[in-house]
């Protein structure tokens, strides 16, 4: 860069820093700029790998949507449990007034430490979210759900009154205000959303999410969660088979897909995922109905192997670490080295 241009740029940067504070503008190559994104595990090994960074990114907005009874709240409660395991603080904005503390406890949530709010209006819910985010003392805030964020005017109005676009305007205004505070405080904010059908759609999917388009733009990660089957033992249904698609991802390559089992009163079955991924990577050998690990038979049938891993957590932890190393850490090291090359090119 020419000397005069360099001087002009330095003067502009110093003026910006005087006016708006140090760090208002910086070079991406500076050592002070963090290139690593912190993540909180989802409680699902496969989903952590599909997200590319080992979980959901902190300092970002995430949207989880799907049909009813697809596992949206279960997944977010697992995120809270993982956050609390790391010593973090979580808040649950229960706009639907449907949080079941006993179910949350079964999934590993420390209910006594969980901050819960049951707001009356959408404005109140989003204002509480903003205050929690600005405190920079909360690691995860869950809003359940966007569809239940009813504007004050609608609550105070008559039943048949028309309030066109009121909720979409509320969401758009709130997200404009929230997004900078979320980044500054490094808080993970998760919005749970429901699916609606667009009328008169001839081509393409008629499905859409509630609350307008603002959340689609502001979300760094969007997850589409679907129930694809039931887990049965004879006639008894033990849980549901679930598929999650990463529809949008600003922090890693998107469009990855994963499947896992959600067991009633237990949550996401980590052991089932370890078995599936272990077999894929040849860490667990499968011969007919028998499964072996390190030349030792560990069970006949998937359910028996799942129980074996549950009773032997050290074996499960060892396998999980091998899977993470194989599928996640190698990928992250490749991404890190390629981004370093990019920054070096920019500096040159």
From Swiss-Prot:
Keywords of this entry: ATP-binding, Cytoplasm, DNA damage, DNA recombination, DNA repair, DNA-binding, Nucleotide-binding, SOS response
Gene Ontology CC, one term: cytosol
UniProt keyword DNA repair, yes or no: yes
Record keyword DNA damage present: yes
Alphabetized GO MF terms: ATP binding; ATP hydrolysis activity; ATP-dependent DNA damage sensor activity; damaged DNA binding; single-stranded DNA binding
Subcellular location: Cytoplasm
Binding site for ATP: 66-73
GO biological process, alphabetically ordered: DNA recombination; DNA repair; SOS response
PROSITE patterns: RECA_1, RECA_2, RECA_3
Disulfide bonds, paired cysteine numbers: none
Pfam families hit by this protein: RecA, RecA_C
Membrane-spanning residues: none
Similarity field: Belongs to the RecA family.
PANTHER family: MITOCHONDRIAL DNA REPAIR PROTEIN RECA HOMOLOG-RELATED (PTHR45900:SF1), RECA (PTHR45900)
Function, in words: Can catalyze the hydrolysis of ATP in the presence of single-stranded DNA, the ATP-dependent uptake of single-stranded DNA by duplex DNA, and the ATP-dependent hybridization of homologous single-stranded DNAs. It interacts with LexA causing its activation and leading to its autocatalytic cleavage.
NCBIfam families (alphabetical): tigrfam_recA (TIGR02012)
Name the record gives this protein: Protein RecA
Gene encoding the protein: recA
């Amino acid at each position: 860069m020419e000397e005069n241009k360099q001087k002009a740029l330095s003067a502009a940067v110093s003026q910006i820093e005087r006016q708006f504070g140090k760090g208002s503008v910086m070079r991406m190559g500076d050592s002070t700029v963090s290139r690593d994104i912190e993540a909180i595990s989802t409680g699902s090994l496969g989903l952590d790998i599909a997200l590319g960074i080992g979980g959901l990114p902190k300092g970002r907005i995430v949207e989880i949507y799907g049909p009813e009874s697809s596992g949206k709240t279960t997944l977010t409660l697992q995120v809270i449990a993982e956050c609390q395991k790391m010593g973090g603080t979580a808040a649950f904005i229960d706009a639907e007034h449907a949080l079941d503390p006993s179910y949350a406890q079964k999934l590993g949530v420390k209910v006594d430490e969980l901050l819960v709010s049951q707001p009356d209006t959408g404005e109140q819910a989003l204002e509480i979210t903003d205050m929690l985010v600005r405190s920079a003392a909360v690691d995860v805030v869950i809003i359940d759900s966007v569809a239940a964020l009813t504007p004050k005017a609608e609550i105070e109005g008559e039943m048949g009154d028309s309030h066109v676009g009121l909720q979409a305007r509320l969401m758009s205004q709130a997200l404009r205000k929230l997004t900078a505070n979320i980044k500054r405080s490094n808080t993970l904010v998760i919005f749970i959303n429901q699916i609606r059908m667009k009328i008169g759609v001839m081509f393409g999917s008629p499905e859409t999410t509630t609350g307008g388009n603002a959340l689609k733009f502001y979300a760094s990660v969007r997850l589409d969660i679907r129930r694809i089957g039931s887990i049965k033992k004879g006639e008894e249904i033990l849980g549901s088979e679930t598929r999650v698609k990463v529809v949008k991802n600003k922090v890693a390559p998107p469009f990855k897909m994963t499947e896992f089992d959600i067991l009633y009163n237990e949550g996401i079955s980590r052991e089932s995922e370890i078995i599936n991924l272990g077999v894929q990577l040849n860490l667990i050998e499968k011969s007919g109905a028998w499964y072996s690990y390190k030349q030792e038979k560990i069970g006949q049938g998937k359910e028996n192997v799942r129980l074996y891993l549950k009773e032997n957590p050290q074996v499960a932890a060892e396998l999980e670490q091998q899977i993470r190393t194989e599928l996640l850490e190698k990928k992250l090291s490749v991404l890190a080295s390629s981004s370093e090359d990019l920054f070096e090119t920019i500096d040159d």
